[in-house]
């Protein structure tokens, strides 16, 4: 059973890396909204984590907080600061893109494996969550290619919320809060 689970894990990880390498390439994404997202990360690192803090390049906050929540910039800043600057801001941004890419698939795989009891049964759903676009703001096309990275990260967190509630729903005595 454990050998079969390792095969499932390797198939999933291999597909995620292969597709991600083709989609994200080897360099920094520099089109659509990515330059602005990289700027937001530089802003979080150099000016501070408060996205509404006065900065002449921050566009007064309105559309920024509505369409570009600061979660992706905060994650990149956390990676940069946790490495004590060893991971530069552009590399931290690439790491955020890879996390945003794989998180929906991995989280869905974990949830479905828990619910269905089989990694093989969970694999198709995880592939759909990993590669789905269908004009979703958090899909591969808009979430990664266009640069709506925080939306993609949010999409990846949803299955983790459900996974955290499974034991409670199945009759545990209290909510996991």
Predicted regions mapped to residue ranges:
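Start-transfer (signal-anchor) and selected internal transmembrane alpha helices
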Residues: 1-22
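Short intrinsically disordered, low-complexity coil segments enriched in acidic
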Residues: 1-3, 59, 175-177
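Generic structural signal for short, solvent-exposed loop/turn connectors between secondary structure elements
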Residues: 6, 10, 46-49, 171
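Membrane-interfacial loop-to-transmembrane alpha-helix junctions, especially the N-terminal start
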Residues: 6-8, 118-124, 173-176
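Active-site lumenal/periplasmic loops and adjacent helix-entry segments of GT-C-fold
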Residues: 16-167
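Short hydrophobic alpha-helices at membrane interfaces in multi-pass membrane enzymes
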Residues: 164-177
